[in-house]
Amino acid sequence: MGIRSFRPLTPGTRQAAISDFKEITKTEPEKSLTHHKHSKQGRNNRGVVTSRHRGGGHKRLYRIIDFRRDKRDIPAKVAAIEYDPNRNARIALLFYKDGEKRYIIAPAGLGVGDTVIAGENAPFEVGNALPLSRIPLGTEVHNIELVPGRGGQMVRAAGGFAQVVAKEGDYVTIRLPSKEVRMIRRECYATIGKVGNAEARNISLGKAGRTRHRGQRPHVRGSVMNPVDHPHGGGEGRAPIGRSGPMTPWGKPALGRKTRNKKKRSSDLIVRRRTQG
C-alpha cells in the first residue's frame, strides 16, 4: 500500500493523504461471504444514544472473516486481496483445495497466487496458522487466540504484530503491540507475520466530510457546553474545568482511571501491564 497526496487546490485536498489502493486486486466482495450490517447509529433497542459520535455514513456489507483458521491441513490459494470497509487491514480471499472459500486478514507480504495452510505441521511461512507451541521464539505473529478454538481475538489491526518471547510449561509468553507481556495457552493458534497495510496510520482524511462518510459524528468538547450538558461546561470565556480533574459527561473521573476489573482471573497471566498513555 502507498499513501496518495494531492495538489493543494482546495482546503479538502491540501491536508489529505489517503490510500492509493494499489494492492487491491478485486473490487466486488464474494457474495457468499457477506451479509447485511444494520447500522445502529449508536442507539440501543429503545432508541437511546448509548455510544456518542456515531451516525450517518455509507452503507456497508459485513465480510465474514475466518478468525478461527479451523480448516486444518488443507492448502488454500490466495485468489484476491480486497478492501474491507469494516477494518483498516486488507482481507485475502482464499480458495481451498476442497472448493470452499474464506476470507482471512491479509498479512504483509501475502500476494495473489500464494498458498497458505493451517495446522500443527504447517511450514513457518507468512499467512500460515500454527499452535503457539510450534512457533519459534522471536517470530512475529498476529490474529492470536486467547482460548483454544475460540478464534483470534488479539492483534488484528493494520500493521500490528506480536512477538513470541518465551515458552514455559503449558504457556507461551507473548509481547503485544501495546508492550504488554502476557502468557497464553500453548494450544492457542496464531498466524505467522504482521498484519498488512501498515501505512494506514499515516492517512489524513483532510476534511470533515470524509469522517462523516465513515459514520463518525462531531466530537464536541465539554468545555464549550453549558453546565447542564457537561461537568466542564459554563463559565465566562475559556474557563478552567473547575474540578479536581477531568470528568466524563456523567461526572465520573476521566483520563487515567483504570477500568479493568481487579478480580479478573486472567490478570494472573499478565506478566507486565501495557504502557499507559
From Swiss-Prot:
Q: Set out the biological process GO terms recorded for this chain's protein.
A: translation
A cellular component annotation (GO) from this entry: large ribosomal subunit
**A single GO molecular function, which one?**
structural constituent of ribosome
Q: What parts of the sequence cross the membrane?
A: none
Entries under SMART domains matching the protein: Ribosomal_L2, Ribosomal_L2_C
Record InterPro entries: NA-bd_OB-fold, Rib_uL2_dom2, Ribosomal_uL2, Ribosomal_uL2_bac/org-type, Ribosomal_uL2_C, Ribosomal_uL2_CS, Ribosomal_uL2_dom3, Ribosomal_uL2_RNA-bd_dom
> Where do Basic residues bias regions lie?
34-43, 209-220, 255-265
User: Which region ranges are annotated with the description Disordered?
Assistant: 28-55, 207-277
Q: Which Pfam family would be a valid example here?
A: Ribosomal_L2
Record-annotated disulphide pairs? none
Q: Which residues form a coiled coil?
A: none
Q: Which UniProt keywords apply?
A: Ribonucleoprotein, Ribosomal protein, RNA-binding, rRNA-binding
Top-level division of the source organism's lineage: Bacteria
Functional summary from the UniProt entry: One of the primary rRNA binding proteins. Required for association of the 30S and 50S subunits to form the 70S ribosome, for tRNA binding and peptide bond formation. It has been suggested to have peptidyltransferase activity; this is somewhat controversial. Makes several contacts with the 16S rRNA in the 70S ribosome.
Family to which the UniProt record says this protein belongs: Belongs to the universal ribosomal protein uL2 family.
What does the subunit comment say?
A: Part of the 50S ribosomal subunit. Forms a bridge to the 30S subunit in the 70S ribosome.
This protein's name = Large ribosomal subunit protein uL2
